[in-house]
């Protein structure tokens, strides 16, 4: 499933990055020290954290995309860093739980 497919399933907004990427797995969490050891390459990372530290962790862990839940807005300095580092970021009005259930249903074709 591509990020474009995910965006459509979530009625999310692309903040920056490449929608053609294909994800593999999902990680949900806001504690950055934990995310550094848990987010895997090509995962979707669902969080409400929107500062430059999230982008710094993403440059180390290489998720397919970061999805900001609950209409969280990516801070301007974080957006600039994401663009400079090729990090794909989306924002969604949905809760982290609802994002997970919709992604799961979309993957299963439900």
Model segments located where?
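N-terminal first-folded block
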Residues: 3-43
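Feature captures the catalytic cores and cofactor-binding loops of soluble hydro-lyases/lyases
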Residues: 23, 33-44, 49-110
